[in-house]
């Protein structure tokens, strides 16, 4: 009786396509004023390939609703319009904190129109970027090379093939004597005491101090008597009132009542928010983290239901 073993694969699963690591990926950051206009987004995607370009909103990135993959993007382009100061104003420290780790080494951050000013570019520099050609680049971290610190080996000067140095054989045991004196072993160098060079007058002389380092004499505030009649008590009270008024003016905070708060926000769907107002136009105008990815276009405000895996508009 012969036994045959079937070694063929029963289920042949298709191999998933591998992404090309050399393909450059782009990230577009859109403020609400740009994302709300369909024609502006259409012009942008006519320049960049949609398959290698991601679109994100400033407010979602700053609020932490979106997490960017690390070391992914080669170019980060900030979309601008006539109100370019809006995009610059939205480049806060929270945005740089989420954006810089997602940039590859050598990746570039730039505006679609114009460039960042000195004050706005300071946040980019503090985040680890380097200014270059009107934009900012993420520097390439060079690998540290360890240095070998060690003394150089002494070379024996021999004048023969048998290891004879200056007429003395070095192959055998060393001989103690005047001829074998090693100057390198003499570490008893004569040191000079620096304090012995100073005279008594030099030690009594005060140390010179720079003008800005001279300590000020402590001044105690005079306290008025319990039954003060000279006017010192009223003078100190005036100074205290002026100091409190100035502190209250510096800490002037705008306070809102409950009626002043905007109650038009709808929090019925937890985690599903939209800031670009272009979700109804289709996937071409939706950001990468849009909850409506894959759904057909619909009218703004129209209720969308999914019943039995079918979209009901």
Swiss-Prot record:
Q: Where is this region: Disordered?
A: 1-25, 151-187
Keyword Repeat attributed: no
Please list the cofactors this protein needs: [2Fe-2S] cluster; [4Fe-4S] cluster
Q: Outline the segment boundaries, as ranges, of region: Fe-S binding site A.
A: 213-230
What cellular-component terms does GO give this entry?
A: mitochondrial intermembrane space
Subcellular location per UniProt equals: Cytoplasm; Mitochondrion intermembrane space
From the UniProt entry, list the residue stretches annotated as the region N-terminal SAM-like domain.
20-145
- Write out the entry's keywords from A to Z: 2Fe-2S, 4Fe-4S, Cytoplasm, Iron, Iron-sulfur, Metal-binding, Mitochondrion
Give the record's subunit note.
Monomer. Interacts with tah18. Interacts with mia40.
Q: What is this protein called?
A: Fe-S cluster assembly protein dre2
Species source reads Aspergillus oryzae (strain ATCC 42149 / RIB 40) (Yellow koji mold)
